Amino acid sequence: RQGEKNGPNIIPHTWVKELVEKDLSDAAIVETNTYYEGDRYTTEQHRETLKVNGWTFCPVDILDENGTTMFPVKGGKWFTEMSVGKDLADYDSLVVLTHFKGHTMGGFGGSNKNIGIGCADGRIGKGMIHTVEGSDNMWSISMEELMERIAESTKSVVDHFGEHITFVNVLRNMSVSCDCEGCAAAPVVTPNIGIVASRDILAADQASVDLVY
């Protein structure tokens, strides 16, 4: 996910443009709208943010622009299904390109957080993850419960794509703040490390954590 307007730490769009033009000419970037009100809350706002941040070199599919669909969650503690952007079901493969960083509630933002939050649609799915019974405050959920819910959302997507999904974490400009904080993100103090790639999401995120700590 690309973060808010002019976010200082996101993956440079020129890197992704070169990758797409060289190796993924038929690819589209996929996004969903946010649950909180910001630069990506509505599809119109989101497309303007994409333009400001330079993501205009290939098609961008805002997955929940045309509605939602449900993916099953197998063996879930919190969910039996997860609401994702409707258009996600139109794809037969997924490259999960993630800017690895910190996250106030999730501990860190890697491939798991990118998919779990990033594929859930902006109104229903993200609400299922962020809110608890009896509260409309998205921040009242405990960190442990939020992380479990994110993981279950992620599992629904990973199970859907099966062998046709791969994970790439970019360990660069790693603030303790999520990219959703945009220009308000805390200053970067961690050295740039490199890029981690795997077809195993747990391996990708664990290797990233190990390299940072």
Question: Where would I find each of the regions flagged by the language model?
Answer:
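Extended, low-polarity segments enriched in aliphatic/aromatic residues
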Residues: 3-213
